[in-house]
Amino acid sequence: MNELTKEWKVSGYFGSKAASGLFQNIISMMPPHETYIETHLGGCAIMKRKPPALNNIGIDIDPEPLSNYDGAYPVRLVNECAHHFLSHYDYTGNELIYCDPPYLRAIRSSLRRYRFEYTQQDHVRLLTLLKSLPCNIILSGYPSSLYDDLLKDWRTIELQAMTRGGPRTEK
């Protein structure tokens, strides 16, 4: 596969932060960190564009994003469930996690977009786990009452993004 095809394939991933320019906003909000952990890689738009940390870890249960990763710096790629990895990782407090899980089915325009779907209970488990971790976290998604209820103490920022279905608010 040539580089042009590979690049198109990665940036064309559903929920990609590359096409809308959303990645610049997300990267600009990142606090200093020694270890960068990105879960639910998808098209790797953030991982490929942010400056490298001392340690970089990309996690996805789907092997396809891992095999398509062609970033400019070394990344430990992990083909595993994000919940499992995050709950067993040995944290130092110098980590930043960027988490962009599949969008809730109830708030998206198409129900058949992900090869590895999340149930509502999977979202609850993930959010509960993220709240318990001793590090900085940036979480992407569309506004939802589930996220608002479970993360009511978290700071939220809304950004406008252009999607295949038109403009949407990322939160």
Give a label for each model feature:
Residues M1-K171:
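Class I S-adenosyl-L-methionine-dependent methyltransferase catalytic core
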